[in-house]
């Protein structure tokens, strides 16, 4: 399929049930042997062909029975309810991976997710401060997640960890933080003091551009 020109630039949150550092980013197995988590994005600038996506927010709750590369994952996409039908369709086309080069984020997701639950269209509250390592997501009746700095276990002082991934397909640089998650949609789980990555990203059909 011919690739359509698209662009997503904005704030990116990835929270999961793994220990701080997310073993998946190091090609290791998930902390608990399986993965449950979420991604969310506030699109500051975006488009799919001539459809503008500026300002929209989306999220996805995900799970895998083992390591991500082994596949058999499930996903429930969530798009901000104010998105127009054309904008919703544009985002679903991006999520499909059919308009992305091989080995890029959405192409990889299309290979390792075998079940997609019915999408949800709902208000999305999204706050993000990468410097302070704080974030908050609220989707009524579906998802609650808070992010705060990792704390030194002795002094309680904020503990900063920055990860650089020059060849990353999700982001190039991220601040690592501590997440609390309560998911009550099709994929149900709760975590406390688990992994969070906060990043600013630029995704295109050719992958990460910034």
Question: Each predicted region: which residue ranges?
Answer:
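Short acidic, gly/pro-rich beta-turn/loop elements at beta-sheet edges
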Residues: 28, 49-51, 87, 147-149, ...
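Aromatic- and glycine-enriched beta-alpha-beta binding-site module
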Residues: 33-105
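Residue-level detector of functional hotspots within protein domains
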Residues: 2-4, 8, 25-27, 63, ...
């Amino acid at each position: 399929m011919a690739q359509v020109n698209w662009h997503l630039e904005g704030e990116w949150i990835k929270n999961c049930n793994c220990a701080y550092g997310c073993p998946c980013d190091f090609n290791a197995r998930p902390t608990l042997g399986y993965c449950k988590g979420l991604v969310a994005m506030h699109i500051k600038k975006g488009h799919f062909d001539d459809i503008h996506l500026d300002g929209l927010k989306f999220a996805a709750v995900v799970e895998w029975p083992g390591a991500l590369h082994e596949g058999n994952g499930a996903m429930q996409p969530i798009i901000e309810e104010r998105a127009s039908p054309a904008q919703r369709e544009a985002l679903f086309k991006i999520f499909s991976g059919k308009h992305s080069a091989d080995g890029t984020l959405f192409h990889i997701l299309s290979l390792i997710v075998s079940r997609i639950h019915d999408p949800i269209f709902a208000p999305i509250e999204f706050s993000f401060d990468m410097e302070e390592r704080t974030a908050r997501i609220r989707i009524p009746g579906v998802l609650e997640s808070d992010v705060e700095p990792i704390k030194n276990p002795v002094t309680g002082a904020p503990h900063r960890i920055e990860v650089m991934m020059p060849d990353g397909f999700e982001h190039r640089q991220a601040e690592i933080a501590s997440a609390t998650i309560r998911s009550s949609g099709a994929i149900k789980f709760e975590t406390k003091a688990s992994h969070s990555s906060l990043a600013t990203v630029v995704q295109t059909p050719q992958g990460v551009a910034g």
